[in-house]
Every structure is written in structure tokens, then in C-alpha cells.
Amino acid sequence: MDIITATLLILAIIPAVSYAWGMRGTTIGGEKGAMLPGAMIGLLIAFFSKILIVQEHFYIFAALGAVSMYLGGSMTYGETLGLSMNQKPAENMKKGLIALFIKGFLWFGLFGAIFTTGINAVCYTYSIIELLIIFALTPGIAVAGYFIFNKPLNVKENKFPKIYFSKTRQESWGALLGALLVLIVFAIIKLNVLTIVFSLSCALFGGIGWVLGQLFQIYSIHYAHNSKSSFCRRFSNKNGVDSWKIMECVLGAFGGLGAAVGFLLTYDNFKLTLFNLEKNDGLLPYNKILALVLFIIWVILLVGDMVHYFIKRPITKKELKKQLKRKQITQEQYAVKRLKAVTAVPRGYEIYDSFTEKIEPVLYCAIPFILICIGSKETALISSFFLLFLVVAQEIGLEKSITKKFNLPFKIVLGVVTLAIFIIQVVFSFDFSVIGTMLLYTFGYELITMVWLGVKTVRLFRKDIKKSTEEHTKKELFKLFINKNKPIITVHAYFTICMILSVLFVI
């Protein structure tokens, strides 16, 4: 790759993935939220590859990126972050930072391994027998890693794993380690330089990025406000800076850079891998009928998964207290809802919730990945666009609420758009183009998020003003609003800059 294109890739991917990781934490979170930065990496790698067959079939790489980043989101890290930042001096700074390096290493390393394994699969570098071996071994070794490294855990009985980076939460990084080992060992056996080098680059930058991001967060919380430099004091969370978001965006920036460096180091290997993709002019299923049948079954399962969003589980008093503490509800709302709240969730709901939670990695990661690997074009198409829209529509339209007045219309609009995207992509095999897909990943996500967040922010501000006995002019109210919501405003101003850059780079 020429130096100009390589430079452009790096300049594009840093702000793009920095934004995407920050948006993950803002809107969706968890495994589904991680699909956005993964898809962003895949999209930009395809676009800047300057290889016609890859650019024409960019959706394959965006889809692989989305499902490859998913599994890392299963790791718990809130209490891990707390080890180094919840107090001054830190409870255990060394352990906290080492833990973040390990978790960042595994998250991005596994992303790189799955992503490049998928590329090898769609390019027929891995045979169907080899893929079956990978699909068979990975879950088993992952489960073994989970039980070896993350069990036993019983807080009440004071039983903890030998290597433990939290206080009370169940960790799962051992499962990711097991899965990563399977893919890397297989790549070593196959002398697959693409997977080995790309994964290592992603892993190192992911680990380092999380440590540096956390150091920025610690500085923002505990040290920036005492700095002699006025510039440094601006980064204090006491001055309205969202220190958590700084950590997320730094991690995203480094993770994106690691993927870019890994791709540049393996560019020649990547080109050699593409022979069969060029020969077949895109994805060619091992068996067209089987691929179609499995795709239809997957879609039916996705529709079935939507049912749990419409089953209203009774809320517990403990959950209500959490909502009140996080200011998600007012004191008045808490008093009213507490009358209907239950002490414990009925057993039937618990079983159903547990089932839907456990089935999601299969529906949103394992099945689409396998289908793409066996050549399902339909799966690649909808996993690059429809699936990314679906997960944000689920979170904003069905998990969160706006106001009683706008809730139903907003849900209907999101539902209609979701269905329309699905029909357009499946019936007409429409890929929405690189620029169209990038617009969804950036301004599409931001627009949907701001509908929810903007209405919520204004509503809370109005309630605060009504409680106040002071009289304010419009100018004073505007200043109060800005000061009260400075973290939100600064974060989304940063997002906007990153989004504009991301779109401009792919025009």
C-alpha cells in the first residue's frame, strides 16, 4: 500500500473508532454496542484497501467486523476500573491497570482473530472441514477457559477465582482467552500470517489503549482540578468533562489504530488471500440451498427474540431504587411506582430473562458469523446495515422511553424504518454503499440517540426550573442549561467532529 493511502487510513480510523466506541457507551453498551466500532473498522479497511473486489463487497468486511467485536462486550469491567479510580489513593492501581491491559488485549485480540478467520473463510483459505473443526473446538475451549480462570465465585462464602479483577461480579475473560487461543493456534498451524500479526497488533493496542484511557480518566477525576495549568484544569470532571467518556474514546482511538497498523503490516498477505474472492466475484456459498435455509431460520429466530421486548416484567423495589439513584426517575415517580413494585421477580420471568440473555450471543454473533463464513451474501448484507440499525432501534425504541406523548409514534417510526431496511436489503440485495453505511454508523446513530437523550435532558431541566423559586431571563436559562449539561454537550460536540471527519474520508 502506498504511503498516502496508509496515512489516510490511519487518519480516518482513529477518529472513527474513537467516536464509535464512545457512542457504544452512550447508547447501547454491552455486546451489541460493540458491533458499531467493529463494523467501522471493517468498513474503513475495505474502503482504504484500494482493491476493487474488496471495495465492491465492503459489506462483507463491515459485517465481519461487527460480529467479531461482539464477544468482548461480555466482559465485566466496571469494578475493574474502580480498582484504580474510585478513591485517592487508588485501592489497587497496579492490579487495576494490569487487568485493563489484559481485558483490552483479549477484546481486541479476539476481534482481530475472528475478523481475519472470517476473511480466510470467505476467501476459501480455510476449507469447510477446517471451519467445522474451528466451530467445534472454539465453544468447548472457551467454556474450559471460563471454568479454569473465572470459577469458583461465591461472594457470600468468600470464594473467588485465583486471578480475579473485580469485587463481586462474575468475570468471563477466561472464555475469551480460550477462544483466542483456538484461533491463534490454528493460524500458526496454517502459517496464517494475516491472523497472527493482525490479531497481535489489535491486542497490543487494545490493551495499551485501555490503560492510557483509564489514566486519563484518573487524572480527570482526581488531579486535573488542582493543576497549575489552566489548560489541564479544563479536563477536570469538576469542570463538566465526562471523564468516563474520555476513557472510552481513547480506548477506541487506540483500538482503531491497532487495526490499521495490523492491516498495513499484513497488506500483502491480505491481497494474496483474496484470490478466490476475486475468482468468484464475491461470496459463493458452499451450498446455496443450505445457506438460504439457514438464513431464513436465523431471521425467524431474530423475530422471535424481539418478543421479549414486549413482555412487561414486573419491576423490583431494588431496581426502582437504582433508577432513582441514577436520576432516571423523579422522587414522585418513584413513590408511585413503588406501590406496584415487587420484592423479587417471579421465577418464570427470571428463567425467560436468563434464556434471552444467553441466546443473544448466538443470534447476533455466532450464527451470522458462521453463515458469512459459508458464503451467505444475504447475511453479510443485513449484518453490515440492518443489524446495526436493529440493535440501536431496540435499545432506544424498546429499552428506553422518551415521553408518553412521543413514545408510541417514535417506536412506530423506528419499526417501519427497520422493516423497510430489511426488505430493501433482502429483496433487492441492496448494500447502501460505503457512504450510506458510514452515514448510518455516524449521523444515523447520533440522530436516534439525540432524539432520546435530547428530550430526556430538556425534560429534566424543565423539572429543575419548576422546582426553583428564582426567576430567570431566557439568557440566564440558556446559560444554566449549558452549565448543567456541559458533559453531554462536550461529548456530542466531539462526536460531531469525529463523524464529519469519518464521512469526509470516505467521500
Segments the model singles out, each with a brief description of its role:
Residues 2-507:
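Alpha-helical transmembrane segments of secretory-pathway, organelle, and plasma-membrane proteins
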